[in-house]
Each structure stands twice: as structure tokens, then as C-alpha cells.
Amino acid sequence: MRLWISVCLCLAGVAGWFGAATSWLPGPPSVTEAISQDAPAPGATPAKVTANNPDNGVTISGHSQENRFVSVPRFFRSGDIPKFAQAVVNGTPLLTQCDVKNRWPDGSLKFAVISFIVPKVASHGTEVRFQNQASGNNEGYLDKSAMLDAAYDFDGTISLAGTASHVISARSMLQAGHFRYWLRGPVVTAVIIEDRDGRSEEVNTDGGTGNPLHPIFEAWFYPASHKVEIGFTVENSWASSTPAKGARNQDFELTLSTGKAAPAVRLKQAKFTQLIFTRWRRAFWIGSDPPPIRMNWNPRYLLQTGAYPNWDIDGLPNASALAAENATNTRLNPARFTIPGYDDIYASKGKGLGGIGKYDQALNAGGQADWIGPANTWDIMYLLTGDPAMEQMMVTNADLGGRFPMWYREADHKAGSGHYFDHPNFGSIDTYGRVVSINARQQVTLNLGNWRPGCAGEERDAINLTGPARVSGWGASQDTSHAPDFAYIPYTLTGKYYYLEQLQMDAAWSVGAYVGCFSPNPEPESYYRQGSMGVIPNISRQAAWAIRTMAYAAFVSPDGEPEGPYFADKVRNNVAMLEGEHGVALSIKDNAERNAAYNYGKVEQYTQSSNPSPLGAWRADDCSGPTPWSQVGCYATPANNMTPSAFGAEATFMEGFILVTLGLVNQLGIADATPLLQFTAKRYFHVLSDPAVNHYSIEQYVYPTRTAAGWVKDWDTYQKLYGRLPGGWRGFESREDTDNAYSLIAMTAVSYMSRLSVDGYSGQQVWQWFYTNRPHLRACSTYSPKFCIKPLATR
């Protein structure tokens, strides 16, 4: 059965927002040329389907229609498309606009938004493949006057009614020249309408000093049909050392309208408070919506690009899994699907838990959650199946997730003690308008619950507010221990700029939220971020999800912009610190800071550098803070199936989380985490392959790490520290059992060790045995595919 995927561009009333520009200046004026389906330009390479170059295309379906515009965000394998992608339908090359955002190190196409006109969309599906062409066809885009042509009826207004009231017009901002290009060419012109430099379009609704509300519109113009999709955003995200230049809570009623000749009200929101450091997005088509189309993303190829975890296509979610995922939405309070969400973190009002979309206010609550993992469950399901309900869920949650107060935009030039975005004191890139950089604000802590932790000299890096931060239940989860990845899949499956910035802001918060103090001579058991170093010596899950999101942002931030290198730098520092912590050789030696991070790993609070675990235990105890070896750790309890002789135990899920993240870091090419995976592979390979070890124990909640005498040193002692050894595999009986299942987390971790060998055990054979003998595919299909991940053969 074919799997169809909706293109987000065609969602009625929910799609919108485009992308971050690689240039702050509008491109030169250009008159739109007629679109024709000509032969390929010289240099085009015919698409071929071979064993080494599998079908790289998509399949578009929906209502039968002709000359349908389509924009497809797409990753390609390294080397598959040397220059630019061209769409081919039934052997006929189409005029194709290819807006390149990223290239592989060999120069071949990595990620682009590919736009073209499909001659005919068949209800049963029209296959589109991609081949190489010499040009991206990025001329012939709309200039300002063309976008203002009456045929587009272009306008979008944001009406804010408060103590002070305002109407902000996208058309007026465009006329004033406050825009920059995101996509350019004859098929689609996408612009970001914003005055980031001058802040001339900003307002307040409290009548106070300074204007914290920052409007952004994003418009995608399709000349062939004169259709425009417009996204609306209001940010309250400015971060400044001068309170009047920064964010402060604002109360207002909201109305969004589209069109110029006869404006249509698309959204009305009763009075609410837009909190500090929040943002939101809503998007609509001007006039009537185009007929919907659906697309098969071809996950078999897409996953081979290495851009995503290699989810198992033999365990794709079935109708039951999709229905169950969607059913969770219908049980939620409808107020959670509004811009302000529903504020009741403890469900004291009798209308269910507070939250925004599917995200609970209490993100850090214990137990399984759809947002814990390499990606949100619903995002994964959309990528793998294209189910329209999952698409709607992805867009809605990505649009509304900005309700949590964690989205910061730098308001100061040469901010903080470090002054520069790219390097403290000796950089070259100004901080203004970008995400908050800890290279500049070296000791800032982006945690409203720990706003001034007391670092020596932190005031030089401070973000100052007009008063106490009042964010009610939305500020309850200000660390990354249960943090979602809000925007990586939404950005890469829509190409929308809002989601790109959401990803970058999320990544910046992920490293900035940890205690920012710097100590020039760190003492044993230190736990600071070490200022601009950006390391996170804390419980494994807190580090795991911060590194995950930073790695995604490093991988997909547009080439030529500083955000990608910035996040890659922080990921590499964390890998170096963890190598120092575990006493393995430093693998990243590109600058002196890696040595500093490595040496810090030798003294931070979880270090085992001078006395590493003989059996490859990731941590002696993964508790909040170090546990003296003379004391029993937090996980070594009879309730967790440990005997009284066990003084320490590691949580298998926490260890699995960090190992899965390190595997992703390897796969994405951000850093070489192989030495760390090699260190921990010893336990996994022995438990799963050594005939003297109980294989089923791999899925226990915790495993023993130490006794009163020190580390567990042999497998006989290891097994005797369990209260009872399991006699078989656990069953998967629900979504909750499967979504964060310990055995599937372990299987995913082992998938990233498949090329290793330890004590004569082959990683590929260990993984194959685990995959074959531990029943799981039915659960992946029926419940959740989140941790159903296989080794990636090649990229």
C-alpha cells in the first residue's frame, strides 16, 4: 500500500512561514518571466535508479488538477545531485527552481527547497524524480512592485487591542522595503517581511517605554496562479542589558486578517498575555485555498541521506498507531490549541492538564511523553507515513510551541563581555538580531527559574528585565532533561523560515539555559557550563536533549551563516568533555578549547577519568549531583530490582538517551563520538552476546555499577546484584510501553555501535541478534516507531 504525504504548502489555514535569508538585503528587481516546461538546461544529468542511486523522488496525489505549483524541501545523499536538483515527471524534465540551503563537503546538494509546476496531478499519484541540472533557476523572481500587483491582493494585518492599540500591515512594511528574500525564482518568490535592523514596526500594548512586540510576516508568492500564502508572527523575544529595549509581558486582543481589497478575518483571539521570550505563528492563504495535494516523501530514500535517525521502514506506523496518536488530541482541552494555550499546570481547574497543543506545561513530569526522544512521535509519524492528521499535528505544535518562555533574540550590538557572536572578544560577527550567543554573553543563564545563579562577574552578561519574570506555569520546565525538539522535522519538511529560527533559538536556549558560570581553576565535582565553552556536566538526559537539538541546528543551518559553526562548536566541546570524563583519548583537536573541555571532563562532577568503569558503565550514578562512593546512589534500590549490595546503579534509559544522541552526532558528521560509543559498547555487547550473561537484563530499568568496594568488575558480580534476573522479554501492550521502551532505546543505541567490535564481539552481529530475537516490529507499527531505528549503512 502506498503511503501519501501532504505538502504543507497546501494546508488550509495552517501552513505558512518561510525561511531565514542568507542575505539581509533584498535582491535586485526582476520581472517575472512566463513559466514554461522547456527541455533541461545544458548540463542536466538524467535521473537513473540504480542500486547505488535509489529512487530519490516523491509521489504527489490529491484532487485531479493541472499545472499545480509545488515546493518540496528535500535532503539528498552526498554525491547524488552534484549541482542543483531538477524535477522529472514521466521522463520529462520540468522547469525547476532550486533554492539551495546546504551543500555537502564535496559540494553536492544536501538540502534545498525545490519548486516546480506539475503538469497534471493524478488522484492515484504522480511520480516526481530528481536529477542534476547546471542552474538553480533563481532569476525571474518578483520584485517589490510585482508583489504589490493587484492580482495578488496582497496584505496581512495584525490588529492588537490593549491599553495602546495598533494595526500592523504586511503590505505597508513591504512597500517600505522592510523585507528580504528566502526563495527566488520564476516558480515561487518567498520573502521575510520584517524590520529587524531598525525595529521601526514594533509596538507595545501597555503604553510603556519601549516596544517589545516584533512583527514578522512571511509570504510565498506563486505567480502561475497568483496565490500567496502568508504567515503571521509576533515575537516578544528581545534580550537586552537595557530593560526598555527588551521583552516584557504584553496584554492584548488579537485579530489576523488577509487580503487587501476585501480583508478576511482569519483568527480572533480574546485578551491574553504574550509572555516574555515567547513567539507564535499562524498562516493562511490569501483568498481561497488551492486544492489540497498529498505527497509520499519516499522515506526509504530520505532516511538514507543520513539527515534523520534511520527509522525502520519495516515497522512503519499502521492505521491503529496513527489513530491512537490522533486520539490523544481529541481528549485535550480545546484551549490548548489557541495561541495562549491553557494555563493550569496541576489540572486544579478540572479541565485537564495545562499545556499548548500536545505539549504539557509540565514538560519535565516523569514518565513517557511523545516529545521525549530524537524527535516528537507525531513528527516521526508524519515523515514516515504522510498521514494528514499527523501533518496537521506537526504544523500546529510547531506553530504554538513558542508559548514556553525560552525564545531569545539578541537586542544589543557587541553584547556582553565577549562582544561577538562567533568567538569571545576576537570574533568578527555582531550579536544583534541573532540568537543569544554565549560567546558574547559568556556567563548568562537563560533560565527564568535561575536567572542570576551568582556567577562571579555575571552582570556584564546579564539580560535585564523591567521587573520580575511572571510566566505562571509556563516557566516550570526550564531545563533540557525532558525537552522536545520543536522544529527540526517541521523545518526540513516545510522549508519554512519560522521553523528554522525556532530550531536555532531552541538550540541557543538548550546550551544557554545551563548554569553559565566560569571557573578558571575548576575544582573536583564542578558542574558549571564554563561560560562560552557551553558544556553540560549534568544528568545524561539533560545533556542528551541539549546536544541533540544543537546537532540538528549545526547540521541544517544555512551555509554561509554563523549559526551552524556556532552550534557545531558547542557540540564538539561537549563531546570533548565527555571524553575527558570517561578517560578515553581526545578525538577532536581542532582548537585549544577542545583541550580545555577535555581537561574539564577530568574534574567535573561525574568524572571517572582516573578510574573508568571496567565494564563500560556510562555513569556510576546518574543522579542530580555526585554521590559519594560510600553512599548508596538514587537508583540502587530494591524497588529498582537491586540487592542491598548494590551501591550504585545507572538508569538504562538515561544512558540510552545520551548514546543515541552521540550516535546522531556521529551520523550527522558534527563530531566523532566513536571513542565514547566504543567505551560503552563493552557492556551492551557482553549482555547481548556473552552466553554467561542474562540477555534479557538489557531492558531492565537500571543496571548495577558499583558495590561498597568500588566498580563492578566482572559479569558474575554484575548479575548477582539484581534482585531477580528476568526470564524473558517484556511485552509491548500500549503506546506508553513502546514509545520510550527501555529495550528499544537500547536497540537504537546498539544500532549506532554496529561498526564497532569489543572483546571479539562484532557490533553488527550483536545488533542483528538483538533485532532478530527481541520481538518488536509489531509494536513499532501498532504503537510507536520512535526508537525503532536501524544502523545506517552509508550516507
Residue ranges with predicted function:
Residues 166-172:
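Glycine- and charge-enriched low-complexity intrinsically disordered segments
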Residues 17-38:
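Signal peptide processing junction and immediate N-terminal pro/mature segment
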Residues 31, 35-165, 178-181, 186-197, ...:
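Alpha-mannosidase-like glycoside hydrolase catalytic domains involved in N-glycan trimming
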Residues 184-795:
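Catalytic cores of extracellular degradative/oxidative enzymes
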Residues 7, 78-80, 147-149, 223, ...:
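Sterically constrained small-residue positions within well-ordered secondary structures
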Residues 2, 6-8, 96, 621, ...:
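Secreted/extracellular small peptides and ectodomain modules produced from precursors
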Residues 1-23:
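Sec-dependent N-terminal signal peptides
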Residues 68, 147, 151-158, 170, ...:
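Generic structural signal of hydrophobic/aromatic residues within well-ordered alpha-helices
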